[in-house]
């Protein structure tokens, strides 16, 4: 059972996964050992899937974001497996979502520049054919947050 303290722990860890356990315990009014047990339980139960380092895209020379809307034209199991394998193999494609509406998928690409989009476009086309693709260049990131709201659990 998830309670207020568990949700608070999850929120704190999302904000800073390197926060010392002693500080988390203090903020949620628990002993360090009780807090440690809760964090371990949250991991075991799958609420915490892992811990990652968030990189500065400009410092690693990937400042450009392009969203690619894709209409596949085919919806057979074999084609979808090929599509999923193709997009999963390209590290510059950082997110893929299946959609409702006029397009089947939206892909988020992290690129060094706009010109590099053509390289990725050709890589994708080597593996799968599309009915339609439309690329959109992000002019500004207004909000980006990997943290999820915890008030729904």
Curated annotation (Swiss-Prot):
It comes from the Bacteria. PROSITE patterns: HTH_ASNC_1, HTH_ASNC_2. CDD domains: HTH_ARSR (cd00090). One of its GO terms (molecular function) is sequence-specific DNA binding. GO terms for cellular component: cytosol. Keywords: DNA-binding, Transcription, Transcription regulation. Residues 2-63 form the HTH asnC-type domain. Residues 21-40 bind DNA. One of its GO terms (biological process) is response to amino acid. Pfam families: AsnC_trans_reg (PF01037), HTH_24 (PF13412). This is HTH-type transcriptional regulator Zrp. It comes from Zymomonas mobilis subsp. mobilis (strain ATCC 31821 / ZM4 / CP4). The gene is zrp.
């Amino acid at each position: 059972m998830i309670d207020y303290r568990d949700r608070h722990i999850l929120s704190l860890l999302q904000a800073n996964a390197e926060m010392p356990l002693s500080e988390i315990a203090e903020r949620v009014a628990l002993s360090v050992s009780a807090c440690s047990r809760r964090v371990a339980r949250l991991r075991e139960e799958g609420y915490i899937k892992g811990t990652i380092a968030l990189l500065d895209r400009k410092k690693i020379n990937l400042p450009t974001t392009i969203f690619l809307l894709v209409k596949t034209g085919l919806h057979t199991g074999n084609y979808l497996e090929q599509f999923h394998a193709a997009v999963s193999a390209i590290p510059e494609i950082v997110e893929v979502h299946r959609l409702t509406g006029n397009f089947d998928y939206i892909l988020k690409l992290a690129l060094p520049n706009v010109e590099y989009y053509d390289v990725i476009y050709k890589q994708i086309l080597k593996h799968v054919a599309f009915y339609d693709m439309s690329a959109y260049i992000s002019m500004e990131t207004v909000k980006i947050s990997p943290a999820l709201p915890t008030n729904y659990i």
